[in-house]
């Protein structure tokens, strides 16, 4: 008896396409049901009668036991949308003077924790790390980032326009303003403290961020934007508290969660940094002793919680970090990032154009003559910050002294940026 060949059914291409789309949709729905929540998470800050001991030991401090931690981190890599492989608890409290953050990064293999560097503002992507994004104006564009690692590294910077044009947070290339008025300014350094500790549970850290170091609206009970990032280096894992798609990073301020529960006092930041230099020369052909002296002062004052005045007289930048060596092999100018503290406050307000290509204002040209020699700055002032909810302002006035062939110069820069709804 002869057996017949089985019949092969040929489905039309449109039917196959529909089946594939339906299968993808059902799979996506099933995946989403076990993935991150659709709504951004909310954390509540707890008012503290006293500050915890800043030693990095969060679990052993009774102050943190009264605080409900924020938890629930979600991966962007290696498994996008999956829960983080390790538990992370973040405790948030505040006093009249400072915002306090304690984090416990649990790890099933504490011996596998990787620490690559402990220098300030070093690359956090090369080891285990934890970062905090704070959007004090809740504008979804600008914010502050504070980070650390198991060695207690201090990492801080300002995000402008969601870091447009810059690399990811924690990296080594985010040390300059980039993008058209946006970027990440890693050279911005403020006053804050952090301590870390490694234990059998993993590692933990405590941050103390004075309110005077932040800029925020004068609301008594504000709601701030908030997000956290944890890196587990040996697993190549990056996880966020407020989940993000793979193509975004911590600079995506618009997708941050919320921080509630703050009851802030009205504070004014006033800082005066004077300096004095003296020089005595004697001997050689001199009949006596030649004496010379230099006096100067830097002042920072918060006109409002969101508007800052910086003033300087006989400016001295001797303590500023030295630029990295660059070799120029073509006819184009070299661009060095601005590291002078006077120019770093709200530097993004003055940034217009594409860095290293078309920039309307480049602050490093102030204090340098046409032939490349240093030209002393006699003094100056700048006002920068925010007026109202949608207006950013910046005004700068600087004067340089006459030296040799370089004449005295005055520089004035003003910018008003109105954000449309």
What residue ranges belong to the model's regions?
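Bacterial N-terminal signal peptides
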Residues: 12-29
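N-terminal secretory signal peptides that target proteins for export/translocation
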Residues: 1-12
């Amino acid at each position: 008896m002869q057996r017949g060949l089985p019949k092969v059914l040929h489905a039309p291409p449109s039917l196959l396409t529909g089946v594939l789309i339906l299968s993808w949709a059902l799979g996506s729905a099933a995946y989403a049901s076990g993935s991150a929540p659709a709504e951004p998470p909310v954390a509540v800050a707890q008012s503290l009668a006293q500050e915890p001991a800043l030693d990095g030991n969060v679990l052993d401090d009774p102050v943190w036991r009264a605080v409900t931690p924020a938890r629930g981190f979600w991966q962007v890599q290696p498994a996008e949308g999956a829960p983080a492989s390790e538990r992370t608890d973040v405790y948030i409290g505040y006093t009249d003077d400072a915002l306090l953050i304690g984090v416990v990064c649990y790890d099933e293999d504490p011996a596998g924790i990787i620490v690559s560097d402990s220098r300030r503002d070093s690359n956090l992507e090369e080891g285990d790390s934890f970062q905090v994004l704070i959007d004090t104006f809740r504008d979804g564009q600008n914010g502050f980032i504070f980070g650390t690692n198991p060695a207690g590294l201090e990492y801080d910077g300002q995000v402008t326009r969601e870091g447009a044009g810059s690399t990811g947070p924690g990296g080594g290339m985010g040390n300059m303003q980039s993008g058209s008025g946006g970027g990440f300014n890693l050279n911005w350094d403020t006053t804050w403290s952090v301590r870390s500790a490694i234990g059998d549970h993993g590692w933990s850290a405590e941050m103390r961020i004075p309110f005077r170091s932040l800029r925020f609206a004068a609301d008594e009970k504000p709601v701030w934007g908030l997000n956290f990032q944890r890196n587990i280096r040996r697993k190549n894992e990056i996880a966020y508290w407020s989940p993000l798609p793979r193509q975004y990073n911590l600079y995506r301020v618009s997708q941050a969660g919320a921080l509630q529960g703050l009851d802030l006092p009205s504070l004014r930041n006033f800082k005066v940094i004077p300096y004095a230099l003296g020089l005595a020369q004697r001997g050689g052909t001199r009949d006596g002793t030649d004496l010379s002296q230099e006096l100067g002062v830097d002042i920072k004052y918060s006109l409002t919680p969101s508007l800052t005045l910086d003033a300087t007289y006989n400016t001295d930048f001797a303590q500023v970090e030295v630029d990295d060596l660059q070799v120029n092999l073509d006819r184009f100018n070299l661009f060095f990032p601005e590291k002078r503290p006077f120019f770093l406050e709200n530097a993004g307000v003055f940034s217009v154009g594409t860095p290293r290509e078309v920039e309307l204002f480049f602050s490093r040209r102030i204090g340098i003559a046409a032939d490349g020699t240093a030209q002393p700055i006699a003094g100056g002032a700048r006002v920068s910050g925010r007026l109202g909810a949608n207006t950013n302002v910046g005004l700068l006035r600087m004067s340089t002294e006459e030296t040799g062939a370089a004449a005295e110069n005055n520089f004035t820069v003003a910018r008003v940026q109105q954000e449309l709804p």
